Amino acid sequence: MEAHSEHLCLRMIRLNADEMEEPLLHYMSYERLVNTYERYKSIGIVAEIAKRVFVETRILMTKVSTAQCMKPGREKRWKGSVRRRSLENFRLRGGIQWYSHACRGMAIGLQN
């Protein structure tokens, strides 16, 4: 968590109003977002801040999880879990497709 907050403090965004740069972490709480809106009177700035915080957090979390999975000794388990998840997704998609075909068949049968 400390590395995550440090990363957000180091990332800067350029606000449209007054060409100011401030850390993203400053805007993460709801109250701060409301205060930012009241200060700049622009929902666009608040939306951009929320979007950037979300996107950067998602990218960072992906990098962190990949880094943790690639530690020595974990690589084999990580590859196995990816393979297992892809098989589960394939089976799930197949089940959904079968269910949708079955529903269509029942609907056609009911129409006749």
Swiss-Prot record:
Pfam families associated with the record: DUF3654
Cross-referenced InterPro entries: DUF3654
UniProt record similarity statement: Belongs to the UPF0329 family.
Name used for this protein in its record: UPF0329 protein ECU11_0080
Organism (species): Encephalitozoon cuniculi (strain GB-M1) (Microsporidian parasite)
Taxonomy of the source species: Eukaryota, Fungi, Fungi incertae sedis, Microsporidia, Unikaryonidae
